[in-house]
Amino acid sequence: MITVNVDLGDRAYPIHIGAGLIGRTELFAPHIKGSSVTIVTNTTVDPLYGDALRAALAPLGKRVSTVVLPDGEAYKNWETLNLIFDGLLTDHADRKTTLVALGGGVVGDMTGFAAACYMRGVPFIQVPTTLLSQVDSSVGGKTGINHPLGKNMIGAFYQPQAVIADIGALTTLPDRELAAGVAEVIKTGAIADAGFFDWIEANVEALNRREPAALAHAVKRSCEIKASVVAADEREGGLRAILNFGHTFGHAIEAGLGYGEWLHGEAVGCGMVMAGDLSVRLGLLDEASRQRLDAVIAAAHLPTRGPALGDARYMDLMRVDKKAEAGAIKFILLKRFGDTLITQAPDEAVFATLAQTTR
């Protein structure tokens, strides 16, 4: 087992990474202070790992209940969030009840948001079961739900007590979900660590094959980088925005097609292709680096052409973005691997990128 720490003073927490961690009682015990636990999971993950988690919690002598949500990005909304609150209230959960998010990014984001809101804040633990959630969404305290007009526009910054990332859970991931997670690994290397990007290029096939050593290193290094960024800028006042490379275009794709049509990581992968193209057009990135970026995204079996939503629709969707200010779209662009720029771009350049990178 590897442990990475997120250094946030009195709100610091560990990220435990390894195989078989869902069943290890001692990893949960220090973070559960009250007399009850509510597991929040979904219809896909509960049959796979719910019993193992409940068995791990049983020796603690807590009252354990489970809320099972429908599976998918399409359900990341108020109605599904209320199912969590319904379960908590029905079970008489109190301020010391610990929520445990067992699932991917949707489950983690909604459980964290529910924890932030219920009785104005109860503790929660992240147990991410997808590669995307292990390398990205479970770390850093971003929680929330989608709105029909924009992704993740309603939420809160609320840190977990711990992240327990069981890489053994990745063996049951569908191939599309695995590729979606590799997209966030590629993003992390591209924005923050040229050496890690080199490693991803050399090992993308090992990741595709789910080789445990490659997956463990990808999760570890991605978490180290994200933990460092979050410690420096917890609430996305500046530096943390670089983690949104590929997300401005990507979120527009998700909202434009309807949540769940493309997986989040698929949209981010394509969004990085689009952001790379725009980076070259603005004279920030060299063509050879853009080609390397596109090649590793394609090698991860991610889409490299965006849907033809139309220029006006893309622009409208990108203006509904957390980085936008007074309606001005901000992009995270590459200068070189490991070096980014947060900037606006002329509409003509964005239109040229859309013409080149959409169907």
From Swiss-Prot:
Pathway: Metabolic intermediate biosynthesis; chorismate biosynthesis; chorismate from D-erythrose 4-phosphate and phosphoenolpyruvate: step 2/7
GO BP field: amino acid biosynthetic process; aromatic amino acid family biosynthetic process; chorismate biosynthetic process
Reaction(s) catalysed by this chain's protein: 7-phospho-2-dehydro-3-deoxy-D-arabino-heptonate = 3-dehydroquinate + phosphate
Localization per Swiss-Prot or TrEMBL: Cytoplasm
Residues binding Zn(2+), per UniProt: E184, H247, H264
An example Gene Ontology CC term for this record: cytoplasm
Keyword annotations from UniProtKB, A to Z: Amino-acid biosynthesis, Aromatic amino acid biosynthesis, Cobalt, Cytoplasm, Lyase, Metal-binding, NAD, Nucleotide-binding, Zinc
Cofactor note: Binds 1 divalent metal cation per subunit. Can use either Co(2+) or Zn(2+).
GO molecular function: 3-dehydroquinate synthase activity; metal ion binding; nucleotide binding
InterPro entries cross-referenced by the UniProt entry: Dehydroquinate_synthase (IPR050071), DHQ_synth_AroB (IPR016037), DHQ_synth_fam (IPR030963), DHQS/DOIS_N (IPR030960), DHQS_C (IPR056179)
Cofactor(s) this protein requires: Co(2+); Zn(2+); NAD(+)
Chief location: cytoplasm
SUPFAM superfamilies on file: Dehydroquinate synthase-like (SSF56796)
CDD domains from the UniProt entry: DHQS
Record EC number: 4.2.3.4
Residues annotated as binding NAD(+): 71-76, 105-109, 129-130, 142, 151
Protein family (similarity comment): Belongs to the sugar phosphate cyclases superfamily. Dehydroquinate synthase family.
Biological function: Catalyzes the conversion of 3-deoxy-D-arabino-heptulosonate 7-phosphate (DAHP) to dehydroquinate (DHQ).
Name recorded for this polypeptide: 3-dehydroquinate synthase
Taxonomic source organism: Burkholderia cenocepacia (strain HI2424)
